[in-house]
Amino acid sequence: MPTTNIKELLEAGAHFGHQTSRWHPRMKKYIFTKRNGIHIIDLEKTVVMLDKACNYINQVVSDGGKVLFVGTKKQAQEILAEEAKRCGMYFINQRWTGGILTNFHSIQSRIDYLVRLEDQQARGDFSRLPKKEAQKLGEEIARLNRTMGGFKEMTRLPDVIFVVDPIKEKIAMAEAKRMGVPLVAMVDTNCNPDEVDYPVPSNDDAMRAIKLICSKMADAVIEAQNAMKVTEVETTGEAQAETAG
């Protein structure tokens, strides 16, 4: 059964590409037509490509893998965080800090520092500090959480990265390629789909389109997680039955 349908994509405005003067020739196979100087994306192909991307995400999670959701453009920030939290995966929705993938050890030390500060705050250690110093540390926690809060529990490189806008996230894209982390991404008509392992042709500016695609990715994660729980329960039941027998 397809992940979505043309009607749902149309209602989200996923078919509207960029001005024809701002296109990438590699997107030609995903473009249906031109209308009023705008490229229109072929949603039949979007349905197929989204299905492939979601199946891949589902398989990665079924194998115990982790997904990192990335989208720092303003209209994607809140949506991306909501969907990543809904499926219990990592996210970056503010600024991509250079080295998150290529210098993960260094980034991990910053995360450890953040976690230590939060532990100290939770224990009430800050109350014993001068007011100004406690306030400064509180601000430091807030600052670090803005950039790292969405992935502070990530102890190794993610198994796949989902990106809302490859052009906006070019540093993340470059780091993923360098480290061999597969990429799933929404690709608008100004993007090069060849740079993505699992491209999903779609408007990447409209909030409704971003919400739709992000939610489908999260659904694919949740579906895999639920299937794993069922398998675990069945395995436990079989083991108990064998023991009882």
UniProtKB/Swiss-Prot annotation:
Keywords: Ribonucleoprotein, Ribosomal protein. One of its GO terms (cellular component) is cytosolic small ribosomal subunit. The keyword Cell inner membrane does not apply. GO terms for molecular function: structural constituent of ribosome. It comes from the Bacteria. PANTHER family: 30S RIBOSOMAL PROTEIN S2 PROKARYOTIC AND ORGANELLAR (PTHR12534), SMALL RIBOSOMAL SUBUNIT PROTEIN US2M (PTHR12534:SF0). This is Small ribosomal subunit protein uS2. The lineage of its organism: Bacteria, Bacillati, Chloroflexota, Dehalococcoidia, Dehalococcoidales. The gene is rpsB.
